[in-house]
């Protein structure tokens, strides 16, 4: 009895991942959800996506000839404060643990980009076109970056080590690979119920992880955190093999017709004709259906299309139909249709 608290809640029968041809943008659509669960899951996933996924970021930079972030560099158009702001936007993917070192050394004139940085084997720059600073004729700059892994946002003050050498400038670190997350909740239909939730998540990452993987990681984090609150063991329910073998027809025939996505008119006609299960419906011929009051050619075509999507059609013969224990069988095989 207690299992009905979660077993009888409707779950999404599909989750669509739309990449828009980009590694950094994705849309995730899940439907149907119980009313209210779109907001519950959408908000929880958004918070975890933005705060709890691990990534890599620059934690500090040392620039030759510069003692602090309020300096300026001869021949460099940006001051050090602007350079540090640009460094914060470098997108990095790093395998393994840190910290790691990266170096850039360039002479002017020209633009210094993230692609000019010399990296070690397990560190990759994901936005090489990102501009760090601009050099005039005769200018030269050398910078050494410290890169580490972490999660969430860490301010520069927390990246300042007590034994840091003079000239090492700490940087605000945004470790999260997820840059933006938004979601919206819409009504969706399942059978004759029109007010289930449809959850749409829009995700933007820095490219170190895809939107689909980011959602999977966030869901796994939530699953792990919530599991501690489950204080019981759920008994495993396995259908005996002999019970499965006794069924002489497609289990889909045990599905009720009011669970099909039919128009209200078609559904009412079936109800008035005492057609409860799909097994009842497919044994009807087209001529018999057209003799049903208020049932026209449009409703007939609609039903034929729905049945065809299930590999069924009108006028089928089911010798073992209806079974004596049809309601018990419908409950037993509900996971198979």
Swiss-Prot record:
The keyword Ubl conjugation appears for this protein: no
InterPro entries listed in its UniProt record: DNA-dir_RNA_pol_insert, DNA-dir_RNA_pol_RpoA/D/Rpb3, DNA-dir_RpoA, RBP11-like, RNAP_asu_C, RNApol_insert_sf
Pfam family, one: RNA_pol_L
Keyword presence, Transferase: yes
GO terms for biological process, alphabetical: DNA-templated transcription
Positions of region (Alpha C-terminal domain (alpha-CTD)): 249-337
Region feature Alpha N-terminal domain (alpha-NTD), mapped onto this chain: 1-233
UniProt-listed Enzyme Commission number(s): 2.7.7.6
Catalytic activity: RNA(n) + a ribonucleoside 5'-triphosphate = RNA(n+1) + diphosphate
Keywords annotated in UniProt: DNA-directed RNA polymerase, Nucleotidyltransferase, Transcription, Transferase
Family membership: Belongs to the RNA polymerase alpha chain family.
Known role: DNA-dependent RNA polymerase catalyzes the transcription of DNA into RNA using the four ribonucleoside triphosphates as substrates.
Record comment regarding domains: The N-terminal domain is essential for RNAP assembly and basal transcription, whereas the C-terminal domain is involved in interaction with transcriptional regulators and with upstream promoter elements.
Record text on subunit structure and interactions: Homodimer. The RNAP catalytic core consists of 2 alpha, 1 beta, 1 beta' and 1 omega subunit. When a sigma factor is associated with the core the holoenzyme is formed, which can initiate transcription.
Protein's name according to its UniProt entry: DNA-directed RNA polymerase subunit alpha
